[in-house]
Structure formats: structure tokens, C-alpha cells
Curated annotation (Swiss-Prot):
A zinc finger (RING-type) spans 45-85. GO terms for cellular component: CD40 receptor complex; centrosome; cytoplasmic side of plasma membrane; cytosol. SUPFAM superfamilies: RING/U-box, TRAF domain-like. Residues 252-302, 340-400 form a coiled coil. Pfam families: TRAF-mep_MATH, TRAF3_RING, zf-TRAF. Homotrimer. Heterotrimer with TRAF3. Associates with TNFRSF5/CD40 through interaction with TRAF3. Associates with LTBR/TNFRSF3, TNFRSF4, TNFRSF8/CD30, TNFRSF11A/RANK, TNFRSF13B/TACI, TNFRSF14, TNFRSF17, TNFRSF19/TROY, RIPK2, MAP3K14, MAP3K5, and TRAF and TNF receptor associated protein TDP2. Interacts (via C-terminus) with EIF2AK2/PKR (via the kinase catalytic domain). CDD domains: MATH_TRAF5, mRING-HC-C3HC3D_TRAF5. This is TNF receptor-associated factor 5. GO terms for biological process: apoptotic process; CD40 signaling pathway; interleukin-17-mediated signaling pathway; mRNA stabilization; positive regulation of canonical NF-kappaB signal transduction; positive regulation of cell population proliferation; positive regulation of NF-kappaB transcription factor activity; regulation of apoptotic process. It comes from Mus musculus (Mouse). It comes from the Eukaryota. The keyword Transmembrane helix does not apply.
Length: 558
């Protein structure tokens, strides 16, 4: 997500993601400005003595730039005010927004004076330079990049730039001026060139090959070359040759015709010989087919005989076994005629036959049951997927907050940041939260390795408006004030806080068309050096806490 250079220079200006044209009231620090009226001391930083940038006021009443007050705290364990030597207590330092507005509305001269006599407020200084006619800019042509005043760009492009484009007089294409002559002499398809055969005509370069097919000066072979004529000359002279050598050409044609007749006669003889050979081969094939049929029948008979032999062998084995069983039964019958009852044996055999019949019928039913089982398995998988989806939904609802406030616990910070650095998971989303039971559906998005101007150096934190179930009943665009916080886990409440009011003209706060709008927030929310400093306690047990609070003032509850 790219931001413009102007945006990258604003440490805590709230901007939309993917927005290259957003305008914010701010100015470049460490730059000399010529104020219309002499800069009052109350607008100067007590540390760097330059105009206040993002002013903060201490408990003793003195004002410092945001970066200067941070430097004082980082350089000294007990920061001292350089004016009255009072100890600067962190809990008494606050952002002086009133002073900031006054500073941003101070009038300054354009740095391009006296050429530009514009007087603008300090907060719009950079915006003015983007349009100032006397600002030095490079030529838009990347190959040129000559520096000039913005007001002279149009004239430079139309008359002086060596890399400007002009239309070719012949093909009407736009060509860079420095390449125009080479284009005409070597590649322009419509540029007039002389005939390669030096005839009197000039033709467009793209039609040279077409012209050569009709050029009277072109060299070509006599039309009777295929019959043996070896004459070669200009197209205009060949007509005279054809008239003068008509008799010779006819003799060549007759000779060629005689040769063709001889060739045809030889081919007929060869064809008759081949037809005779084909008939002989056909008779041989029929003979082989007849023999093959006989072999097939013989093989079939042999196969039947072999199967009969195998069956006979099997039956012989069974007969021998049955014969042995019969002998045993006869012995038993002879020995115990009064005790043997064969009816029970017959009944048992009949019972087994019925059971076999039932099992054969069960096979078909098993096939049907297998099909039904497959259908039920498919339905069960669908229900499992729906249950998983519902379970995820219940988890979100269970952790949802309906007061317009979100406390987001980000665990495993080091692992997630490493994944962001490696490009696997560049951002993480919080669980949704709501301004009320039927209110706006919102969430937070964090880039642990930074995004845009904060990539690689800062943690970027954004606020996201999501599509909700009651959007049609809510007022749009979203207009509430939003506060983003990084919570201090030491108990000293040294939180990092940034607040902004939703811009009703931004598409980030319109009614969502998709699942969520473009995120809006601070790409340079907190630097990695501050966040990961062991002296601070923003990260504890590899966990940090982020808070998002929405001002519910004037928000009508459904």
C-alpha cells in the first residue's frame, strides 16, 4: 500500500490506505519559513527554538515539538525543562491542539518569492508547493528530467524538450524528436523511397515488395523457363523476347509434351505389373485367413477339451471323497440301524440351501445400502462444515463488545512480526465490535512490520468499518470520533494515544459495498524502537494490548 512522499513525512497524520491525494494540515519540520509577521516566542519550541511542530505542553507551561519532548525524555532519565529547570513529569505532558491550530494558521511567504508572491497558511505550505508556478520541477519526460519552473513546463514540452514527441509527416505516428530523422530514413512505413531497380517511380517503404511484382525494370525469368528456356531479363523486355522466340518456345513445349507421354506410358506398364502383384498377394492373404480360421477352431476345441479334463479331474476328486463318505455312512448304518435318522440330515441340507439363497439376495441389498451410506456420508460432511462455521460465528459473538470499545490482545508478537517481515502474513485483524446491539460493525487492523511510510520502522494501526446486519437502519457516512491506543502494561498509564474524526467525504466511512471498507488510520502509529524498548512495558510476555474507542456522542441508538 503506497502513500505519497508528502504523506510519508507526516508522522501521525491520519490518512486512508491506498490514498495518494489526501490533504492534511501539517508542515515539514527542520525547514526555514519566512513568516509574514515576526514569529512570536510562544510559537517557538523551548528546546530547538524553531516553529512548534505538533506542540506538547509541559506542567510548567512551556511548549515543545513532539520530537523534541521525546528527545528530552530519551536523553535524560529525569528530563529537565531548559527554560525554568523544572522536572518534566510525563503524566503532565499533553498535546496542545489549540496551539497546533494557531501555528498551522500562521501566514508565510512562498519559498519561491519574489517570483511567487503568494501568502499561505503554514499548514497548507506543502499543498501550495504542489501547485506553485515558480516551484522547480523536472521535465515530465523521464529521458530528459531537465529542471525548470512549473510555469515553463508546457512551453518546454512543446518547443524545447529534446525528448518531446512530434507527429511524423508521413505515417502520422508520435515520434521522439531526436529519433525523427532516423525513423524517417530507416523505419517509417510511409516514407517515400526510390525503387531498388532504379525505375522512375518513388513508393512508400511498406509497398516496395508489392511494387517489385509489377516494376518494368525488375529482372525475371522467361515464362517458358519450366520448358527449358534460359533467357532472363527485365520485365519490359521479356514481352519482346516472347514474340521473337515463339517458334523456339513451341518446340520446347512439344519436346516436353513428348517426354510426358513417354513417362505416362511407362507408368501404365508399371501399374499393370503392380496390379498383378496385388492379386497374387490377395490370394495369399485369403489362404492364410483360411488356415488361421482352422487353427482358431482347433484351438477352441482344445480349450473345451482342456476345461472338460479339468472339470473331470475335479469331479473325480469329489467322487472319491463322496465314495469314502458313503462307505463310512454304510458302516454306521450297518452297525447302528436303529439309531440313524437321515431325515434330520436332509432337513439340515435344505436349511443350508435356503440360507445360501437368502445370502445371495442380501448381496443386492448390500449394494443399495452402500449407495445410501455414501449419500448419508456426504450429508454428514455438509453438516460438519456448517457446524464449524457456526462454531466460528459463536466464538466471534461470544467475544463481541457492543459499547463501541475494543480491547485487542495480540499474542505471540515476535512470531507474528517475523511472519510480517517475511511477507507471509503482513497484517492481522481484530475480532469485530459494535457501537450498540444494532449499531455499526467495526474492527481494527494492525501491520506489525509497518505499512506505507511506516513499513519496516513502525507498527501501523488502522480502523475498519465492516458490513453489518443493520446497516440499512444506520446513518451514513460514519461520522464519529475514533481513538487508537497502545496500552502501557506497567500500570503507569503511559499509553500512546492518537485520535481522529471520521471524514464524511472519504470512501473509508461510507456504507460498505463489500465485506469491509478501505482501512483508515495511522501508518506510523508507534516506532519499533519505542514499542520494543526494554525500558517500556508496551510488550509483556510477548503480548501487547491495543484499544479502539468510538465516541458515541450524538449517536442515535436504535
Amino acid at each position: 500500500m503506497a502513500h505519497s512522499e508528502e504523506q510519508a513525512a507526516v508522522p501521525c497524520a491520519f490518512i486512508r490506505q491506498n490514498s495518494g491525494n489526501s490533504i492534511s494540515l501539517d508542515f515539514e519540520p527542520d525547514t526555514e519559513y519566512q513568516f509574514v509577521e515576526q514569529l512570536e516566542e510562544r510559537y517557538k519550541c523551548a528546546f530547538c527554538h524553531s516553529v512548534l511542530h505538533n506542540p506538547h505542553q509541559t506542567g510548567c507551561g512551556h511548549r515543545f515539538c513532539q520530537q523534541c519532548i521525546r528527545s528530552l525524555r530519551e536523553l535524560n532519565s529525569v528530563p529537565i525543562c531548559p527554560v525554568d529547570k523544572e522536572v518534566i513529569k510525563p503524566q503532565e505532558v499533553f498535546k496542545d491542539n489549540c496551539c497546533k491550530r494557531e501555528v498551522l494558521n500562521l501566514h508565510v511567504y512562498c519559498k519561491n518569492a519574489p517570483g511567487c508572491n503568494a501568502r499561505i497558511i503554514l499548514g497548507r505550505f506543502q499543498d501550495h508547493l504542489q501547485h506553485c508556478s515558480f516551484q522547480a520541477v523536472p521535465c515530465p519526460n523521464e529521458s530528459c528530467r531537465e529542471a525548470m519552473l512549473r510555469k515553463d513546463v508546457k512551453e518546454h514540452l512543446s518547443a524545447y524538450c529534446r525528448f518531446r514527441e512530434e507527429k511524423c509527416l508521413y505515417c502520422k505516428r508520435d515520434i521522439v524528436v531526436t529519433n525523427l530523422q532516423d525513423h524517417e530514413e530507416n523505419s517509417c512505413p510511409a516514407y517515400p523511397v526510390s525503387c531498388p531497380n532504379r525505375c522512375v517511380q518513388t513508393i512508400p517503404r511498406a509497398r516496395v515488395n508489392e511494387h517489385l511484382t509489377v516494376c518494368p525494370e525488375a529482372e525475371q525469368d522467361c515464362p517458358f523457363k519450366h520448358y527449358g528456356c534460359t533467357v532472363k531479363g527485365k520485365r519490359g523486355n521479356l514481352l519482346e523476347h516472347e514474340r521473337a522466340a515463339l517458334q523456339d518456345h513451341m518446340l520446347l513445349v512439344l519436346e516436353k509434351n513428348y517426354q510426358l507421354e513417354q513417362r505416362i506410358s511407362d507408368l501404365y506398364q508399371s501399374l499393370e505389373q503392380k496390379e498383378s502383384k496385388i492379386q497374387q498377394l490377395a490370394e495369399t492373404v485369403k489362404k492364410f485367413e483360411k488356415e488361421l480360421k482352422q487353427f482358431t477352431q482347433m484351438f477352441g476345441r482344445n480349450g473345451t477339451f482342456l476345461s472338460n479334463v479339468q472339470a473331470l479331474t475335479s469331479h473325480t476328486d469329489k467322487s472319491a471323497w463322496l465314495e469314502a463318505q458313503v462307505r463310512q455312512l454304510l458302516q454306521i448304518v450297518n452297525q447302528q440301524p436303529s439309531r440313524l435318522d437321515l431325515r434330520s440330515l436332509v432337513d439340515a441340507v435344505d436349511s443350508v440351501k435356503q440360507r445360501i439363497t437368502q445370502l445371495e439376495a442380501s448381496d443386492q441389498r448390500l449394494v443399495l445400502l452402500e449407495g445410501e451410506t455414501s449419500k448419508h456420508d456426504a450429508h454428514i460432511n455438509i453438516h460438519k462444515a456448517q457446524l464449524n462455521k457456526n462454531e466460528e460465528r459463536f466464538k466471534q459473538l461470544e467475544g463481541a463488545c457492543y459499547s463501541g470499545k475494543l480491547i485487542w490482545k495480540v499474542t505471540d508478537y515476535r512470531v507474528k512480526k517475523r511472519e510480517a517481515v517475511e511477507g507471509h502474513t503482513v497484517s492481522v485483524f481484530s475480532q469485530p465490535f459494535y457501537t450498540s446491539r444494532c449499531g455499526y460493525r467495526l474492527c481494527a487492523r494492525a501491520y506489525l512490520n509497518g505499512d506505507g511510510s511506516g513499513k519496516g520502522t513502525h507498527l501501523s494501526l488502522y480502523f475498519v468499518v465492516m458490513r453489518g446486519e443493520f446497516d440499512s437502519l444506520l446513518q451514513w457516512p460514519f461520522r464519529q470520533r475514533v481513538t487508537l491506543m497502545l496500552l502501557d502494561q506497567s500500570g503507569k498509564k503511559n499509553h500512546i494515544v492518537e485520535t481522529f474524526k471520521a471524514d464524511p467525504n472519504s470512501s473509508s466511512f461510507k456504507r460498505p459495498d463489500g465485506e469491509m471498507n478501505i482501512a483508515s488510520g495511522c501508518p506510523r502509529f508507534v516506532s519499533h524502537s519505542t514499542l520494543e524498548n526494554s525500558k517500556n512495558t508496551y510488550i509483556k510476555d510477548d503480548t501487547l494490548f491495543l484499544k479502539v474507542a468510538v465516541d458515541l456522542t450524538d449517536l442515535e441508538d436504535l
